[in-house]
Design a protein with these regions (language model features):
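Class I S-adenosyl-L-methionine-dependent methyltransferase catalytic core
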Residues: 1-157
Length: 157
């Protein structure tokens, strides 16, 4: 099985941060420190591949599974801990950027590939994200602010 984590960040939800089936990708490669509630915090973003999720540098139909946990903040201070930890998205361009990312992910997925999508609705409702994708998930958690959703690549025949 080949897995791609498109926006790995600091690999927060991975139990094994060097999971052998997984290629970790992120546009950022950096170590940040910031104050968070009076404590200095450090976050290291060290992907295997540094690339933008709107231009995934892999051949068509490479991965069985893609994990997509993109930044969800349009409003965050540039030096804030949350902005450094999660990254931010552009208020005006995020729908276009997400549409492009979704197309790229589907291109990189094998015909029976699966997309696991994670989202936090704190600033943008998940329905708006699905509208940008142009596709509904087959299942997902709709009860909390943070959403996990699973997509299957559609057969193009």
């Amino acid at each position: 099985m080949k897995i791609l984590d498109v926006c790995c960040g600091s690999k927060m939800f991975w139990y094994d941060k060097q999971e052998p089936h997984t290629t970790y990708m992120d546009v950022r490669k950096a170590t940040y420190t910031a104050m968070d509630r009076g404590n200095e915090r450090k976050i290291e973003i060290n992907p295997d591949i540094q690339a933008d999720w709107k231009n995934i540098p892999f051949d068509d139909e490479t991965f069985d599974l893609v994990v997509f946990d993109p930044p969800h903040l349009v409003r965050a201070g540039k030096t804030s801990w949350l902005a450094k930890k999660y990254g931010t998205i552009d208020l005006m361009n995020w729908p276009h950027d997400f549409r492009e990312a979704f197309r790229e992910i589907m291109r990189a997925l094998k015909p029976t590939g699966t997309l696991i999508f994670k989202w936090n609705e704190d600033q943008i409702p998940i329905k708006e994200v699905f509208k940008a994708f142009g596709q509904q998930p087959i299942l997902g958690d709709m009860r909390r602010k943070t959403k996990w959703s699973v997509f299957i690549k559609e057969d193009e025949r």
